[in-house]
């Protein structure tokens, strides 16, 4: 393959686009890989399409290697299967829906579990047909409220999704392990630094799931590691170690105190110590019980319901953790104080939740026998020694508090948690029988009995992976593509006119005939300096400069990742580059 920049659909930019927030977005636009077509939608230009196709081919190769077969489902699907599974409402506002001229409702599919289950139901009737593994690389859609960060958070994106069907849990586990191993090979080939972390299943359903998170300072996901063991988890999936419970009746009696002008935890702790409430002057924020009011709207519900969460006052509520726990319900911060005078803002306590009929969930650290300084449900008043199990009975526990560095590891219980940011590039799930139950997918077992297959699903964001590679492989001058996914193997720069251009084109043709992918900068209207700047911005791994040393029979080979340069004889250049590319 030979591309000439004099005719290539490519325009580089000298300045960062104003709306580009993250490095990958800035560089992919500046280097001419993408153009914004709409909010959350991008046109792939030739170099970008080459990278996208190469990433997809790496994924396709590894999926075929584990025995999955490639299919292609429609992107436009009828609503009914998604109503049957419940996801028509569970996906909420993220689902893009439409009505055709006949009045029938459709959706632009975000994932394809439903059609995959229906396909297996239609094709297979016997246990002899299993296991089954299928995958597709398909455009998906999500109605993002605020598309941002270029390819990392768009409304339209390319995704690989695979589905496994097995007759029992052992088969599902084997399929899950195969795909997990394949993902590790894929991300290694793509040159990505990543972590595999425990995750929640969310609207997908099922039991076990893991995310593959590419390490990145701009990542929206936060995950934990442990200083003493190999435990990793998305913070949404972190469990809190609870202290031992004790006898609530052994605690002192509750006392109510006047605490004017203390609507915040800091002001309350300051007053409590100044006045030595309950005979103490060592109160800390962690001794207080903060009560946070949220609104919850289950899928398809006509109205929201109130939820109050009690947690130690030194912790903030992490709404992402709450949303993950309560999915698929929509969670928002309560702002209807004027309509609920029974909820005393700033002085809310747990003692009245049952009387008010408000659902009350607490942090796992709030166990029977723990005593708290908390609101007395009267303006300007708080109570000490409000004891869980005596003065209030929660409706349950919830993982809602922020996770902090130094928190105890829930796996080994000896190490401390560390926090890092990452970008989700893959997610694998053990779905179980949620979808085969929904569509009554049954086959004949070996003893003539009815057997219901169990499913797994395995997703990779293909277009997102392009952006993530760009995030991890760039420098101050531009992109630095790994060889496996670079749009071309060699970038030939004719640093002059006449013989330099002719030699560069001749070398390009010979390299293309040898099986390499070549980009030749044969533009006659730009300076050598601009060509060198563009070569670094575009980020092809090897640049060959045909310039002033051509008269001596030499060209300069520049290695983009390391910056090393070497003069190579022109008559040996093709063999040199072919060997270099093929050796890795």
Swiss-Prot record:
Molecular functions per Gene Ontology: aminoacyl-tRNA deacylase activity; ATP binding; proline-tRNA ligase activity
Keywords: Aminoacyl-tRNA synthetase, ATP-binding, Cytoplasm, Ligase, Nucleotide-binding, Protein biosynthesis
Annotated stretches, region: Disordered: 242-261
Primary location recorded for the protein, binned into one broad class: cytoplasm
EC number: 6.1.1.15
Highest taxon of the lineage: Bacteria
Any one Gene Ontology cellular component term annotated for this protein: cytosol
Pfam families in UniProt: HGTP_anticodon, tRNA-synt_2b, tRNA_edit
Region forming the signal peptide: none
One biological process term in Gene Ontology: prolyl-tRNA aminoacylation
Cell compartments where the protein resides: Cytoplasm
Family membership noted in the UniProt record: Belongs to the class-II aminoacyl-tRNA synthetase family. ProS type 1 subfamily.
Record text on subunit structure and interactions: Homodimer.
HAMAP family: Pro_tRNA_synth_type1
Entry's free-text remark on domains: Consists of three domains: the N-terminal catalytic domain, the editing domain and the C-terminal anticodon-binding domain.
Its biological purpose: Catalyzes the attachment of proline to tRNA(Pro) in a two-step reaction: proline is first activated by ATP to form Pro-AMP and then transferred to the acceptor end of tRNA(Pro). As ProRS can inadvertently accommodate and process non-cognate amino acids such as alanine and cysteine, to avoid such errors it has two additional distinct editing activities against alanine. One activity is designated as 'pretransfer' editing and involves the tRNA(Pro)-independent hydrolysis of activated Ala-AMP.
Protein's name in the database: Proline--tRNA ligase
The organism of origin for this protein: Salinispora arenicola (strain CNS-205)
């Amino acid at each position: 393959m030979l591309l000439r920049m004099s005719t290539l659909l490519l325009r580089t930019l000298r300045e960062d686009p104003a709306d580009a927030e993250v490095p990958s977005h800035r560089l992919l636009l500046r280097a001419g890989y993408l153009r914004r077509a709409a909010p959350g939608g991008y046109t792939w230009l030739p170099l970008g399409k080459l990278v996208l196709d190469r990433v997809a081919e790496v994924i396709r190769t590894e999926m075929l290697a584990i025995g999955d077969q490639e299919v292609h489902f429609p992107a436009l699907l009828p609503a009914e299967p998604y109503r049957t599974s419940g996801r028509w409402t569970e996906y909420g506002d993220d689902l893009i829906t439409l009505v055709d001229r006949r009045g029938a409702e459709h959706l632009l599919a975000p994932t394809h579990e439903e059609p995959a289950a229906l396909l297996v139901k239609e094709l297979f009737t016997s246990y002899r047909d299993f296991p089954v593994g299928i995958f597709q690389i398909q455009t998906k859609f999500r109605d993002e409220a605020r598309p941002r960060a270029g390819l990392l958070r768009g409304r339209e994106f390319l995704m690989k999704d695979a589905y496994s069907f097995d007759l029992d849990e052992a088969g599902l586990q084997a399929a899950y392990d195969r795909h997990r191993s394949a993902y590790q090979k894929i991300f290694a080939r793509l040159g990505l630094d990543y972590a595999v972390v425990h995750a929640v299943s969310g609207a997908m359903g099922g039991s076990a799931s893991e995310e593959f998170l590419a390490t990145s300072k701009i990542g929206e996901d936060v995950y934990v590691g442990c200083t003493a063991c190999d435990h990793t988890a998305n913070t949404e999936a972190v469990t809190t170690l609870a202290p031992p419970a004790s006898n609530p009746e052994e605690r002192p009696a509750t006392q109510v105190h006047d605490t004017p002008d203390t609507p915040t935890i800091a002001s309350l702790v300051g007053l409590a110590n100044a006045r030595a409430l309950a005979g103490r002057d060592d109160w800390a924020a962690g001794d207080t019980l903060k009560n946070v009011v949220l609104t919850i709207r289950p899928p398809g519900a006509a109205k929201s319901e109130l939820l109050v969460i009690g947690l130690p006052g030194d912790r903030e509520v992490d709404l992402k953790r709450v949303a993950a726990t309560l999915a698929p319900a929509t969670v928002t911060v309560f702002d209807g104080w004027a309509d609920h005078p029974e909820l005393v803002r700033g002085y809310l306590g747990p003692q009245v939740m049952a009387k008010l009929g408000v659902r009350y969930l607490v942090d796992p650290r709030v166990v029977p026998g723990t005593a708290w300084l908390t609101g007395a449900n009267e303006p300007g008043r708080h109570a000490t020694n409000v004891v869980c199990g005596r003065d209030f009975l929660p409706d349950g526990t919830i993982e809602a508090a922020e996770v902090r560095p130094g928190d105890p590891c829930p796996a080994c219980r000896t190490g401390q948690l560390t926090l890092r940011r990452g970008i989700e590039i893959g997610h694998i799930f053990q779905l179980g029988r949620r979808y085969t139950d929904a569509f009554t997918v049954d086959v004949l077992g070996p003893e003539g009995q009815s057997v219901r297959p169990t499913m797994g699903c395995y997703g990779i964001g293909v277009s997102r992976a392009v952006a993530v590679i760009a995030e991890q492989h760039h420098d101050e001058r531009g992109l630095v593509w790994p060889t496996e996914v670079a749009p071309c193997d060699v970038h030939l720069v004719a640093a002059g006119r006449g013989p330099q251009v002719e030699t560069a084109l001749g070398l390009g043709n010979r390299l293309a005939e040898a099986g390499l992918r070549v980009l030749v900068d044969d533009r006659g209207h730009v300076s050598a300096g601009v060509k060198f700047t563009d070569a670094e911005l575009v980020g092809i791994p090897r640049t060959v400069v045909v310039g002033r040393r051509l008269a001596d029979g030499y060209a300069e080979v520049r290695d983009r990742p390391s910056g090393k340069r070497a003069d190579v004889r022109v008559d040996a250049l093709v063999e040199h580059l072919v060997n270099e590319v093929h050796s890795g």
